[in-house]
Amino acid sequence: MTDKNVNPDDDQADENRDDNVDERFADIVGDVDIDADQSATDSPAPEELSRESQLEALLAERTEDLQRLQAEYVNYKRRVDRDRALSRQSGVDKVITDLMPVLDSIAMARQHGEVEGGFKLVVDELEKVANNHGLTSFGEVGDVFDPNLHEALMQMPMEGVSVTSVSQVMQPGYKLGDRVLRPARVAVSDPDPNATSADESSQADGESAQADEDDETPRNE
Protein backbone atom coordinates (compact mmCIF):
# COMPACT_ATOMS: atom_id res chain seq x y z
CA MET A 1 0.00 0.00 0.00
CA THR A 2 1.46 3.29 -1.14
CA ASP A 3 0.95 6.50 0.91
CA LYS A 4 -0.14 9.61 -0.95
CA ASN A 5 1.84 12.76 -0.40
CA VAL A 6 -0.24 15.49 1.17
CA ASN A 7 0.44 19.05 -0.05
CA PRO A 8 0.24 21.59 2.77
CA ASP A 9 -0.77 24.27 0.31
CA ASP A 10 -3.87 22.30 -0.66
CA ASP A 11 -4.92 22.05 2.97
CA GLN A 12 -4.56 25.78 3.37
CA ALA A 13 -6.66 26.42 0.27
CA ASP A 14 -9.40 24.16 1.57
CA GLU A 15 -9.44 26.02 4.87
CA ASN A 16 -9.63 29.36 3.11
CA ARG A 17 -12.48 28.08 0.95
CA ASP A 18 -14.38 26.90 4.01
CA ASP A 19 -13.90 30.28 5.68
CA ASN A 20 -15.27 32.04 2.61
CA VAL A 21 -18.33 29.81 2.58
CA ASP A 22 -18.94 30.52 6.24
CA GLU A 23 -18.66 34.26 5.69
CA ARG A 24 -21.04 34.18 2.74
CA PHE A 25 -23.53 32.12 4.74
CA ALA A 26 -23.30 34.57 7.61
CA ASP A 27 -23.89 37.47 5.24
CA ILE A 28 -26.95 35.80 3.72
CA VAL A 29 -28.38 35.01 7.16
CA GLY A 30 -27.70 38.56 8.26
CA ASP A 31 -29.49 40.00 5.23
CA VAL A 32 -32.48 37.78 5.90
CA ASP A 33 -32.62 38.95 9.51
CA ILE A 34 -32.42 42.60 8.45
CA ASP A 35 -35.22 42.14 5.90
CA ALA A 36 -37.36 40.45 8.51
CA ASP A 37 -36.77 43.26 10.97
CA GLN A 38 -37.58 45.85 8.29
CA SER A 39 -40.81 44.04 7.38
CA ALA A 40 -41.79 43.94 11.02
CA THR A 41 -41.13 47.68 11.28
CA ASP A 42 -43.09 48.54 8.12
CA SER A 43 -46.18 46.56 9.21
CA PRO A 44 -47.69 48.21 12.31
CA ALA A 45 -48.70 45.94 15.07
CA PRO A 46 -52.41 45.67 15.93
CA GLU A 47 -51.73 47.57 19.13
CA GLU A 48 -50.25 50.47 17.16
CA LEU A 49 -53.22 50.52 14.76
CA SER A 50 -55.63 50.63 17.68
CA ARG A 51 -53.70 53.48 19.28
CA GLU A 52 -53.71 55.46 16.02
CA SER A 53 -57.46 55.03 15.64
CA GLN A 54 -57.99 56.24 19.20
CA LEU A 55 -55.88 59.34 18.54
CA GLU A 56 -57.80 60.12 15.34
CA ALA A 57 -61.12 59.77 17.15
CA LEU A 58 -59.88 61.99 19.98
CA LEU A 59 -58.68 64.61 17.49
CA ALA A 60 -62.06 64.62 15.73
CA GLU A 61 -63.84 65.00 19.06
CA ARG A 62 -61.62 67.88 20.18
CA THR A 63 -62.04 69.58 16.80
CA GLU A 64 -65.83 69.35 17.11
CA ASP A 65 -65.66 70.75 20.65
CA LEU A 66 -63.52 73.64 19.42
CA GLN A 67 -65.93 74.44 16.59
CA ARG A 68 -68.88 74.35 18.98
CA LEU A 69 -67.06 76.63 21.42
CA GLN A 70 -66.23 79.05 18.63
CA ALA A 71 -69.89 79.18 17.51
CA GLU A 72 -71.02 79.78 21.09
CA TYR A 73 -68.53 82.63 21.43
CA VAL A 74 -69.73 84.26 18.20
CA ASN A 75 -73.35 84.07 19.39
CA TYR A 76 -72.37 85.40 22.81
CA LYS A 77 -70.51 88.36 21.30
CA ARG A 78 -73.44 89.14 19.00
CA ARG A 79 -75.85 89.03 21.95
CA VAL A 80 -73.58 91.25 24.07
CA ASP A 81 -73.27 93.81 21.25
CA ARG A 82 -77.05 93.84 20.78
CA ASP A 83 -77.70 94.26 24.51
CA ARG A 84 -75.12 97.03 24.68
CA ALA A 85 -76.76 98.86 21.77
CA LEU A 86 -80.21 98.48 23.35
CA SER A 87 -78.91 99.74 26.69
CA ARG A 88 -77.32 102.76 25.04
CA GLN A 89 -80.48 103.50 23.06
CA SER A 90 -82.58 103.19 26.21
CA GLY A 91 -80.36 105.76 27.92
CA VAL A 92 -80.67 108.15 24.98
CA ASP A 93 -84.45 107.70 24.94
CA LYS A 94 -84.70 108.59 28.62
CA VAL A 95 -82.58 111.72 28.28
CA ILE A 96 -84.48 112.90 25.19
CA THR A 97 -87.84 112.21 26.86
CA ASP A 98 -86.78 114.32 29.84
CA LEU A 99 -85.69 117.11 27.47
CA MET A 100 -88.96 117.29 25.51
CA PRO A 101 -90.78 119.59 27.98
CA VAL A 102 -87.78 121.94 27.85
CA LEU A 103 -87.84 121.86 24.06
CA ASP A 104 -91.59 122.60 24.15
CA SER A 105 -90.95 125.68 26.26
CA ILE A 106 -88.22 126.78 23.85
CA ALA A 107 -90.57 126.36 20.87
CA MET A 108 -93.23 128.44 22.61
CA ALA A 109 -90.70 131.13 23.51
CA ARG A 110 -89.51 131.22 19.90
CA GLN A 111 -93.10 131.75 18.67
CA HIS A 112 -93.34 134.80 20.92
CA GLY A 113 -89.94 136.12 19.83
CA GLU A 114 -88.36 135.59 23.24
CA VAL A 115 -85.33 133.57 22.07
CA GLU A 116 -82.69 136.29 21.83
CA GLY A 117 -79.16 137.16 22.88
CA GLY A 118 -77.25 134.79 25.14
CA PHE A 119 -80.35 132.69 25.72
CA LYS A 120 -80.47 131.98 21.97
CA LEU A 121 -76.91 130.63 22.05
CA VAL A 122 -77.86 128.21 24.82
CA VAL A 123 -81.02 127.18 22.98
CA ASP A 124 -79.14 126.58 19.73
CA GLU A 125 -76.53 124.45 21.49
CA LEU A 126 -79.18 122.40 23.28
CA GLU A 127 -81.10 121.76 20.07
CA LYS A 128 -77.85 120.85 18.32
CA VAL A 129 -77.07 118.20 20.93
CA ALA A 130 -80.59 116.77 20.63
CA ASN A 131 -80.30 116.66 16.84
CA ASN A 132 -76.93 114.91 17.06
CA HIS A 133 -78.69 112.11 18.93
CA GLY A 134 -81.23 111.76 16.09
CA LEU A 135 -84.06 113.89 17.53
CA THR A 136 -86.18 115.83 15.04
CA SER A 137 -89.37 117.82 15.50
CA PHE A 138 -92.30 117.82 13.09
CA GLY A 139 -95.74 119.37 12.71
CA GLU A 140 -96.30 122.46 10.55
CA VAL A 141 -99.39 124.38 9.51
CA GLY A 142 -100.52 123.10 6.12
CA ASP A 143 -99.29 119.54 6.63
CA VAL A 144 -101.69 116.87 5.42
CA PHE A 145 -103.17 115.21 8.50
CA ASP A 146 -101.60 111.82 9.23
CA PRO A 147 -103.00 109.89 12.22
CA ASN A 148 -99.61 108.20 12.60
CA LEU A 149 -97.94 111.57 13.16
CA HIS A 150 -100.66 113.91 14.40
CA GLU A 151 -103.08 113.93 17.31
CA ALA A 152 -106.11 116.05 16.40
CA LEU A 153 -107.29 118.05 19.41
CA MET A 154 -109.70 120.18 17.37
CA GLN A 155 -111.41 119.64 14.06
CA MET A 156 -113.49 122.07 12.02
CA PRO A 157 -114.64 122.44 8.41
CA MET A 158 -113.08 125.20 6.34
CA GLU A 159 -113.79 126.56 2.88
CA GLY A 160 -111.07 126.20 0.29
CA VAL A 161 -109.62 123.05 1.86
CA SER A 162 -109.54 119.99 -0.37
CA VAL A 163 -107.96 117.53 2.12
CA THR A 164 -107.86 117.37 5.91
CA SER A 165 -104.88 119.53 6.88
CA VAL A 166 -103.16 120.96 9.96
CA SER A 167 -104.47 124.44 10.68
CA GLN A 168 -102.74 125.03 14.03
CA VAL A 169 -99.91 123.35 15.98
CA MET A 170 -100.44 123.28 19.74
CA GLN A 171 -97.41 121.12 20.48
CA PRO A 172 -94.78 119.82 18.04
CA GLY A 173 -94.15 116.12 17.63
CA TYR A 174 -90.77 114.45 18.01
CA LYS A 175 -89.03 111.58 16.25
CA LEU A 176 -85.92 109.72 17.29
CA GLY A 177 -84.61 108.38 14.03
CA ASP A 178 -87.65 106.86 12.32
CA ARG A 179 -89.48 106.18 15.59
CA VAL A 180 -92.20 108.57 16.75
CA LEU A 181 -91.65 109.55 20.39
CA ARG A 182 -94.68 111.82 20.51
CA PRO A 183 -97.25 112.82 17.89
CA ALA A 184 -97.80 116.47 17.12
CA ARG A 185 -100.89 117.87 18.87
CA VAL A 186 -102.76 119.91 16.28
CA ALA A 187 -106.03 121.43 15.12
CA VAL A 188 -107.15 120.27 11.70
CA SER A 189 -109.37 121.68 8.99
CA ASP A 190 -111.68 119.46 6.99
CA PRO A 191 -113.16 120.23 3.58
CA ASP A 192 -116.50 122.06 4.09
CA PRO A 193 -119.26 119.73 2.86
CA ASN A 194 -121.68 122.70 2.61
CA ALA A 195 -119.29 124.53 0.33
CA THR A 196 -119.06 121.45 -1.85
CA SER A 197 -122.86 121.22 -2.02
CA ALA A 198 -123.09 124.92 -2.88
CA ASP A 199 -120.53 124.48 -5.65
CA GLU A 200 -122.41 121.52 -7.03
CA SER A 201 -125.69 123.47 -6.83
CA SER A 202 -124.14 126.45 -8.61
CA GLN A 203 -122.77 124.18 -11.29
CA ALA A 204 -126.17 122.54 -11.71
CA ASP A 205 -127.88 125.95 -11.92
CA GLY A 206 -125.39 127.04 -14.54
CA GLU A 207 -126.00 123.95 -16.61
CA SER A 208 -129.77 124.43 -16.29
CA ALA A 209 -129.54 128.08 -17.37
CA GLN A 210 -127.43 127.10 -20.35
CA ALA A 211 -130.01 124.51 -21.31
CA ASP A 212 -132.80 127.12 -21.09
CA GLU A 213 -130.85 129.48 -23.32
CA ASP A 214 -130.38 126.73 -25.83
CA ASP A 215 -134.12 126.06 -25.82
CA GLU A 216 -134.96 129.76 -26.37
CA THR A 217 -132.56 130.15 -29.26
CA PRO A 218 -134.59 130.47 -32.54
CA ARG A 219 -134.15 127.60 -34.90
CA ASN A 220 -133.64 128.23 -38.60
CA GLU A 221 -136.27 126.38 -40.61
Swiss-Prot record:
Residues 1-53, 180-221 are annotated as: Disordered. It is found in: Cytoplasm. Residues 194-205 have a biased composition (Polar residues). This is Protein GrpE. The keyword 4Fe-4S does not apply. Belongs to the GrpE family. Residues 14-26 have a biased composition (Basic and acidic residues). The gene is grpE. Its main location: cytoplasm. It comes from Cutibacterium acnes (strain DSM 16379 / KPA171202) (Propionibacterium acnes). SUPFAM superfamilies: Coiled-coil domain of nucleotide exchange factor GrpE (SSF58014), Head domain of nucleotide exchange factor GrpE (SSF51064).
